[in-house]
Amino acid sequence: MAPRPLVHLITDKSVMTRLAVVAQPTPHTQPEQHAPPVQWLRVKYAKRGRARFTSHRDFGRAFERALRRAGVPMAYTSGYSPHPRISYANAAPTGAASEAEYLEIGLAAVCDPDKVRDALDAALPHGLDVVEVVAASPGVLANELTGSHWRVDVPGLSAATLQAAADAFLAKEMVQVQRMTKNGMREFDTRAAVITLNVQDARLTVTLAHQTPLVRPDDVLAGMRLACPEFVPIDPPVLTRLAQGRLDPESGVITELRH
């Protein structure tokens, strides 16, 4: 028996027509393009009470819902999955309260910052409070946030124990600690980021320079424990960011952002 041909010649015009239709390439669909923002606003907000346990991801969802409820005319990114133009910077860790968190939003229409503040504050959950909204220039927020001032309440320890731990920590040239990050376990120096560290009763106040990786107050507490083994907090410390802005490394003064 003769071998069957590998390719058969198709002469049926109807079959050829169907094959031609199937073979047509699918037209390429361009993603939707959105106009750039006509106005940028800087939002200063606080995390108070139980809202301090809100994760950064959960806050982002709550904030986007608040924008919709408040009727803020957001600008959107272009592409297949457009999202509102929101720029976050140096968010406080989950569990920390804050009086000075910042983000920026890009708008599709010019709005009165005070009206946006009032509408957003009314739309956000209790404990997430909008402190101030001002006009801003895009793309500079992270560069302007160079330091933070924190209060750390350490219940159950005497002022003498806190002072001894602070003195031992400050006497070191370098204090390496480890922390799990999204990129795995990282080891970094906490001492270089500490500009001031003071003790008042059962409370610490610490001024931190923002560096990479970002040193947090809980990292400083871990470093204090390494420097002073007697420093063992009985109850979980309560962290509160009091200020964030431009840091003068010589004086340790934080200048809050305005415009």
What are these regions (language model features)?
Residues W150-K182:
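A contiguous pocket-lining binding segment that forms or flanks enzyme active sites
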